[in-house]
Each structure stands twice: as structure tokens, then as C-alpha cells.
Amino acid sequence: NLNREVAKLNYRIHTDAIQEHLTVPELTQSQKSFIYANEADMLNVVLFGKTAREWKNENPNKKGNMRDYASIHQLLVLANMESYNAILIGQGISQPERMEKLHDLAARQLNVLDSVNLDDLPQLPDIKKE
């Protein structure tokens, strides 16, 4: 799924910001993992309304995680949220304030994207390698 792969690449930008600004060398690997998971769950709550664990508990028979079942619009907004959160982390903005800003961003973007008919967008030509 190309959309999921783009989101994964953008996640790297997000995790680099977390590593640079929210962790210190003195933390154990377990403590660092908690910080990364906490940031990922904040994005999940803002976009999907629940943590990864809550989603998994509600969907025990589904493989993967909630992001694997996200719409193209949700994945695009998630990628944008990760980039924006990385910037906000770099600016030293607290998590509650970042959460509020990210919620506003997600709501605006989903509203715009939900009004777009993908069939109305220009299509790229099908280029086959020979």
C-alpha cells in the first residue's frame, strides 16, 4: 500500500524529532520506547479518537494496526500531522498544546479532503518501462 509506505517514511521525520528533542542519553531503552509510543498514541487519539491498544482490543481479529485500515485521507493527514508535530517538538511546545494544534490541523484537512472527489483529480499517465 503506497499510502501506508509514505506514512512510514514520514514517521522517520517524526521519530528523529522525538529523539533529538524529547529524549536524553541517560534514559533507558524502555523509557525511550515509552516516549515514542506516547507520541504515536497522541497522534492516534487526535486522528482516530483512540489509542493503538484501544483499537486492538476492539478489533482482536484484525491483523496489523489501525493505521493499516486507515483511509487515504486519514493517511495523508497523519503524514502531515507527523511533519507538523516534528516542527512543534523542535519549537519546544508542550504535548497538550501540540495536541490542540494537531487536532485543529486534522479537522481542517479532513474537512477539505472529504469534499474532494478523487475521480475529479487529473490522472497521471500510465508509463510502462520497456
Please annotate each region the language model reported.
Residues N1-E130:
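Positively charged, phosphate-engaging catalytic surfaces used for nucleic-acid and nucleotide handling
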